[in-house]
Regions:
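N-terminal lobe of the biotin/lipoate ligase/transferase fold
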Residues: 2-160, 211, 241-249
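A short secondary-structure junction signal
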Residues: 70, 120, 164-166, 188-190
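Short, conserved beta-strand/beta-arch hydrophobic-aromatic motifs that form part
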Residues: 73, 79, 160-180
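A structural signal for short, well-ordered beta-strand segments
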Residues: 109-111, 151, 163-165, 176-180, ...
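C-terminal accessory segment of soluble enzyme catalytic cores
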Residues: 185-249
């Protein structure tokens, strides 16, 4: 599948980012995976060049499966025809982690951060993302935790949020996916995160009701701001022209 070209106008120019603890929020809405990836890559390049402060990207995907750099294709349990029958895309992802599913009903956040201006420690960054999710879930009465030696957030022995990141020159991309109210049957196409003994769950399965994703986003932003010591501000002056060709390949 070919990605739609993207124009993303850079309008936030900082004289210096080293003393600024601003983090811009960019909500892409529902987009194809390739479209989101183009935006992530462009924002990450701007961050490396210190043209913008940190950025927190939100997106929702149609049904798709991504396989990370450390993943095994054997953890994909469906063939191409089965995926096509159910309208599920498949992509190799330039991130850490194994295989995972994305789709409607997930809260997805991709922080693009320069860890040199926070803490140059990838392990601490991962644990901090987990705590953002754990604290957010606690706000809704869901008691979750991390598991030593495993990445992600868990309720008992079931995973409720997956994390897979990439770092380049200490700038992060990709991020986290929290299961709010997805159709969990789509996880049957894979061995989630390569862990055959673990299952998946969602906030809806635990609470028995649908939670407003906008409220989850609001609470997550509160905890993200506190844990990473960033002032979140909307990136209003961004123009994304999904139809104009030749803007960025």
């Amino acid at each position: 599948m070919m990605s739609t070209p993207v124009c993303l106008k850079q309008v936030h120019k900082e004289k210096t980012c080293s003393k600024v603890k601003t983090c811009l929020m960019l909500d892409l809405g529902r987009k194809e995976y390739e479209q989101s990836l183009v935006v992530q890559n462009l924002v990450a390049e701007w961050r490396k060049k210190k043209r913008i402060p940190d950025c927190l990207i939100f997106v929702e995907y149609p049904h798709l499966i991504t396989l990370g750099r450390s993943g095994s294709i054997q953890h994909l349990l469906a063939d191409r025809s089965m995926l096509e029958k159910h309208g599920v895309g498949f992509f190799l992802a330039n991130r850490g982690g194994d295989i995972t599913y994305h789709g409607p009903g997930q809260f997805i956040a991709y922080p693009v951060m320069d860890l040199k201006e926070w803490q140059p420690d990838v392990g601490r960054y991962l644990r901090s993302l987990e705590h953002c999710i754990i604290n957010t879930l606690a706000d809704f009465g869901v008691l979750a935790d991390s598991i030593p030696e495993l990445t992600g957030v868990w309720v008992g022995d079931k995973k409720i949020a997956s994390i897979g990141i990439r770092t380049s020159q200490w700038v992060t991309s990709h991020g986290l996916a929290l299961n709010v109210s997805p159709d969990l049957s789509y996880f049957d196409f894979i061995v989630p995160c390569g862990l055959r003994s673990k299952g998946m769950t969602s906030m809806m399965e635990i609470l028995g009701a649908v939670v407003d994703t906008s409220e989850i986003k609001r609470r997550f932003c509160v905890h993200f701001s506190q844990i990473f010591e960033r002032d979140l501000a909307p990136w209003r002056a961004v123009s994304i022209d999904w139809q104009t060709s030749g803007c960025f390949a």
